[in-house]
Amino acid sequence: IYPWTVNEPADIENLQGQLASSTNYTLDGMNAKNPTSAGSTTSRSGAPYSISIEAVREFKVVTNQYDVGYGRSGGGTVSAVTKSGTNDFTGSMFAYNRADWLSSSYDIRGNRRQNDFSTSQYGFTFGGPIIKDKLHFFVAWDHQQDSRPLIIADVQSAEDELRFNVTRATLDNFVTIARNKYGVSNSPQYGTFDKKRNSDAAFARIDWQINSNNLLTVRNNFTYDNNKLGLQDNTTINLYESFGDDLNIDNSILASLRTKVNAKVTNELKVQHLYTFQDSNPGDQLPSYNIPRAIVENVASTINGAVRTTNIQIGGHRFAQEKFTNNVFQIVDNIYYNTDKVKYTFGFDLMQTNSESLYGSEVNGRFHFNSVANFNNLTPYRYYREVPLVADPTVTSNILNAGIYGQLQTKIALGLDLTLGLRFDYAKYPTATFNQLVFDELGIRTDNKLQSAILQPRVQLSWDVNENHKDYIRLGAGIFASDLNNYAVINNLYFDGNHTATVDVRSPNVPMPNFIDYRNNYASIPTL
């Protein structure tokens, strides 16, 4: 979408060669970045909406602007501004339906399709005056229902056997063992399955012209994404029960007051609360607390006279017990002072992020088997688990980001503008609990304090050649600082030796797996 832009996994944009987490996202000038691990608010789920596109007035990717208002962005900023109502009532309705019967009866492999393949998108916008020239509103809603097959080792032809490195006979034998000795459901575990995803984006904005000098804006942006069977694990073939569900709810509410103090001074105050919630859970065939997974390696099949192998997994998804809740409070105030020759900007930006994070990767545990025979004999060669040491291993982090800045802009020659600015950003991160045992054994402190204070001078020359508004030359230099990826903070708080302990044992010390018990009693899962 823009030069020097790279689309990385999870739809996180990398700008100008910087880390994807260095890209800032703003909506109406306020934070719209995912507080857990960067990207847009919905980047972790890959949801289709961060905001209804019908609510966006304009957006831009900023990589060559030295304005001090752009903070916490080492690579650049993706910025969007929302629509508002006018004195005229306007609205729209839209619908798009890619019906199942319009889709090919065959999948990409040429096999006849058995599952629904359709997308329905619809919504509306409506805006206008509540009181003309005084009070206006604008609302928008987008909905998407996406249905597409979930393909799990769907072997229907000789070409599929080569593609998946497994035959149906091998799969049937594997599933029979999994059902008889590991309690796997009698429902199909491989093939194609219906997968439906529901997503919504709702937007509302009110603008109140209190008087000739004061404009109050209140807007709310809400997104919802329910991605059933959306979590796929990292084994080559994951049977149906290993797929997890992902639910994401995000909401931001903003209040902005723009005040014209006098002919030369304008003040703009913005206050926002951003809420993000991600809830990952096992699929419907597993208990809500999740169970270990069993990874069987070297599952062999004879295909075209040659032995081919693959890895197959049953049990729970490795992080289908994670939950991330974030509340971000932000206040920004900008003062604009304009004289006949110079435009001044002064402001501050305070942001407090309060997070509760239940990190869950490998908390359910995993068994490794090096053959189907050992899988059948209940003899794994390895067991690994991050065992919780406390009843609730949720970690709480409170992060403060504060910025103060000022700049001037003036015309120094025909078509030549000079911008000089200075920004100072301070960040304070939470400190993990001190672990005496780690210090005694390894000499490492787990309670190291982390904070940053970065001064960022910036200068830019912008030349509109001959002021013909056709040719522009820009030259700028400055320092840009991005905030730390909060996921690193979560890891630091969680892996301090007080919340979990790692179990990693090899044969002959591996406990005998009893998945039937695990499915009925969380306490039966092997711990320390």
At which residue positions do the language-model features occur?
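Transmembrane beta-barrel wall of Gram-negative outer-membrane proteins
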Residues: 90, 115-226, 245-273, 457
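Periplasmic N-terminal accessory/gating domains of Gram-negative outer-membrane beta-barrel systems
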Residues: 1-84, 109-110, 119, 123-125, ...
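Solvent-exposed loop/turn elements at secondary-structure boundaries
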Residues: 4-7, 288, 300-307, 432-456, ...
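Residue-level signature of outer-membrane beta-barrel architecture
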Residues: 63, 82, 128-130, 208-210, ...
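Transmembrane beta-barrel strands of outer-membrane/channel proteins
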Residues: 93-99, 139-143, 218-222, 269-275, ...
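Flexible glycine-rich, low-complexity coil/linker segments exposed to the extracellular/periplasmic environment
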Residues: 160-189, 294-316, 372-392, 503-528
